[in-house]
């Protein structure tokens, strides 16, 4: 497993009173291997290499131990693939890695529920270096399109406290993080909620690749640009671990990356390689950037009502203003 490491970059607009806050983080990009022992071994090697490189936190891809199931509809009950959050194999595996390597380890799983339809939650978790489960966040937005039929497997995460900020207690200090998942990364509202909540870093564990209905359309550049934009407009570091390789109908394209609040890529993985990205972040750069460009201070929440209004669509599926706000000349086609 190759390791690609980025030392800390200087701030582009250092505040006069700034105090640097370095923290080293890592992600592991992997492919799903049918043999569960070999699959775990590649993750174990990646986490160990991250620890050897000085990482205090390592982030793993979506549905860490399993094949991506949603390229097709379930043939039986969806919960045949689900597991207990507290006592299932994923958290047990993360506990083992975290205590052995003495660092915080993030992962993701298909969390079982008692829902009659068999759907569970797509849940991100964090285990600290003592093996304690210190954070969990359920995926809020669920994709519904060809090759990513997740609505047949996962329920939407609860709206109440949907975007919690977790304080990780590291040797370098406290690190406030958010743990949304994959499809959440396309929604600017999610990054903004975390930014307003005081997060300094978001991890989006991801499973993204080809589009079965449009095999020649490479969405990787759009995916990266979207998340880089969220980083800039919310003053956030972003850690985005993806998988690679062919699984069913999807060719996952890797390209995992880490980005800072200035939009600088601190590392990007190849499309077709299991590897580790390591980067030392200066958390104080969030304060630097948001002091120069005070997005939160100059917001206009009183003008944002339409953002939380139900969506009305015309017969082409394009959103139009809600009936209360629409003038006669804006009526749906």
Kindly give the residue locations of the regions a language model identified.
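Short beta-strand scaffold segments in enzyme catalytic cores
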Residues: 107-109, 122-126, 164-166, 256-258, ...
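Conserved residues at the C-terminal ends of beta-strands
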Residues: 31, 61, 140, 205, ...
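Active-site catalytic loop in hydrolytic enzyme cores
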Residues: 3-12, 83, 96, 114-225, ...
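C-terminal beta-strand edge segments of enzyme domains
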Residues: 2-13, 229, 237-333
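CN hydrolase (nitrilase-like) catalytic-core segments centered on the catalytic cysteine
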Residues: 86-106, 176, 182-276
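N-terminal active-site segment of His-dependent metallophosphoesterases
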Residues: 2-57, 203
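Cys-nucleophile CN-hydrolase/nitrilase-fold catalytic domain and related Cys-dependent amidase chemistry
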Residues: 36, 45-130, 134-136, 145, ...
């Amino acid at each position: 497993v190759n390791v690609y490491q980025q030392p800390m970059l200087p701030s582009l607009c250092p505040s006069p009173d700034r105090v640097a806050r370095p923290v080293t983080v890592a992600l592991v990009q992997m492919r799903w291997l049918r043999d569960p022992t070999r699959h775990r071994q590649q993750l174990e090697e990646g986490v160990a290499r991250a620890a050897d490189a000085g990482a205090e936190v390592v982030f793993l891809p979506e549905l860490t131990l399993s094949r991506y199931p949603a390229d097709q509809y379930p043939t039986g009950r969806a919960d045949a693939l689900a597991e207990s959050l507290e006592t299932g194999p994923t958290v047990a595996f993360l506990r083992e890695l975290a205590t052995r390597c003495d660092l915080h380890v993030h992962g993701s799983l298909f969390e079982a529920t008692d829902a009659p339809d068999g759907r569970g939650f797509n849940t991100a978790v964090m285990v600290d270096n003592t093996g304690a489960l210190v954070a969990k966040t359920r995926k809020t937005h669920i994709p519904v399109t060809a090759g990513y039929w997740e609505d047949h497997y996962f329920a939407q995460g609860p709206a109440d406290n949907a975007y919690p900020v977790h304080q990780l207690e590291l040797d370098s200090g406290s690190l406030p993080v958010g743990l949304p998942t994959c499809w959440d990364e396309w929604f600017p509202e999610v990054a903004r909620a975390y930014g307003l909540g005081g997060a300094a870093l978001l991890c989006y564990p991801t499973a993204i690749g080809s589009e079965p209905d449009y095999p020649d359309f490479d969405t990787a550049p759009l995916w990266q640009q979207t998340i880089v934009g969220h980083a800039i407009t919310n003053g956030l570091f972003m850690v985005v671990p993806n998988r690679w390789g062919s699984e069913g109908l999807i060719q996952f394209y890797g390209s995992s990356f880490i980005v800072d609040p200035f939009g600088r890529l601190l590392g990007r993985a190849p499309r077709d390689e299991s590897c580790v990205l390591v980067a030392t972040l200066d958390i104080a750069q969030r304060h630097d950037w948001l002091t120069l460009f005070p997005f939160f201070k100059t917001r206009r929440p009183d003008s944002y009502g339409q953002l939380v209004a139900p969506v009305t669509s015309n017969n082409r599926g394009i959103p139009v203003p809600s009936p209360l706000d629409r003038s006669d000349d804006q009526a749906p086609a």
